[in-house]
Amino acid sequence: MKNVKLIAFDLDGTLTQHKEPLTEENRCVLEALAQRYQLLMVGAGQTRRIFRQLGEFPIDIIGNYGLQYARYDAQTQDLQVMRDLQLPCDRDSVEQRVTQLRGRFGWETYAGENVEYHPSGCVTFPVLGTKAVQQDKLSFDPDRKKRRAVYEQVVAAFPEYHVFVGGSSSFDMAPKPYNKYHALDEYCRELGITHEQVVYVGDDYGPGGNDESVYLSDITFITVDDYRTFGEKMAPLLAD
């Protein structure tokens, strides 16, 4: 691919198994790419957690859909947090709307809390509750059909948020305008990089996926449906 300056990546499902460490094989691919391109992580979670999952691979990281941003400092071999926004959340209103949706969809039984609130201002609607057993979460909606069936209704209930079909049993919400496209576009504008010079690599590009905003944009998108094929997908970018 010609004229590419920046390659941006999703993490879970793209570079790694969900919540699992970066494999040595995929780390080697990143190291090879770093010799030719500027690399960037664009994540839904905290920058520090992403950095740990990557085995402290030297890379700039956007976290929380753009609410957080950290640069890799080669001298300290650590992240330097440049932005860490914490936006307000009307918890009473969110709580009421989630409770109403639970009643509408028959999801009134849950373990723990009704809603999970994050310091950034992001919100998680955990269908099975904040203290659900992991096995129950994994088996609830593995193909996302249950959540996609009601996705538009959840979106309509939260017009001030970007809503995503998150994890195995939840909906994740980021305050507008924050999503991965907005975060990547902002990063490019700050560095003077055009969209034509960017490639994004992700797995969650279907309806409600948190990579969908980039997938539907003018940025070149490479789909990865299995993190074990990451090296194969990156081969054209490493070809002479």
Locate each region found by the language model.
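Active-site phosphate-binding/coordination module
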Residues: 20-112
